[in-house]
């Protein structure tokens, strides 16, 4: 457990550090995780977490029916699927650092993206940020507790213990925002 908490791949760790440094200017010029919590904590009770899997397509009609009755937290991989079906999430979350994941944001959905908050881990691939900016999407870069990040004294922005998957990240954010 101790080894895993410090990472299990030095090249992956170096990639995360490099991408964090590259993304740092965007992190400090956008709203912080602490601001997100202070402005949106407790504003609603019901959340729906949408992840990609074999059952997503089957559940789309049901999701569309209840979309206006709950806050939708959406995994990055589900975002283009929801957009295609006109189901607007309130939040889209992403934590992967590989370039392939960035492609979920390489699209222009125009007005559909208005009022969606994109919550992205600060070590994400820079293409993710590039695509979010290109389409004028509102986003926040969030950091988890990591030694190299803590040395930079960015406590003002807050730390988000987000788990190991985007679905877990979504669940934890619903908890931190006091959804029931």
Where are the language model's segments positioned?
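Alpha-helix C-terminal capping segments
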Residues: 80-86, 173-178
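N-terminal donor/sugar-recognition subdomains of glycan-related enzymes
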Residues: 1-49, 54-70, 84, 89, ...
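Active-site/ligand-binding-proximal alpha/beta "capping" segment
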Residues: 126-179
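Short, glycine-/Ser/Thr-/acidic-enriched flexible segments
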Residues: 54-55, 78-79, 123-125, 146
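Glycine- and other small-residue-rich loops at beta-strand/loop junctions that grip anionic moieties
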Residues: 52, 121, 159, 163
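Short internal beta-strands
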Residues: 70-78, 90-98, 116-123
């Amino acid at each position: 457990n101790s080894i895993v908490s410090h990472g299990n791949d030095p090249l992956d760790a170096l990639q995360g550090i490099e991408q964090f440094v590259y993304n740092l200017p965007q992190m400090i010029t956008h709203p912080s995780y602490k601001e997100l919590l202070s402005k949106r904590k407790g504003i609603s009770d019901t959340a729906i977490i949408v992840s990609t899997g074999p059952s997503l397509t089957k559940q789309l009609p049901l999701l569309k029916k209840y979309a206006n009755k709950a806050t939708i937290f959406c995994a990055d991989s589900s975002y283009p699927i929801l957009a295609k079906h006109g189901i607007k999430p309130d939040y889209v979350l992403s934590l992967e650092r590989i370039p392939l994941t960035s492609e979920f944001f390489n699209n222009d959905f125009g007005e559909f993206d208005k009022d969606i908050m994109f919550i992205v881990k600060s070590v994400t691939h820079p293409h993710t940020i590039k695509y979010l900016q290109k389409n004028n999407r509102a986003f926040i870069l969030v950091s988890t507790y990591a030694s190299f990040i803590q040395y930079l004294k960015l406590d003002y922005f807050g730390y988000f213990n987000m788990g190991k998957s985007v679905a877990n990240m979504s669940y934890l954010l619903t908890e931190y925002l006091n959804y029931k």
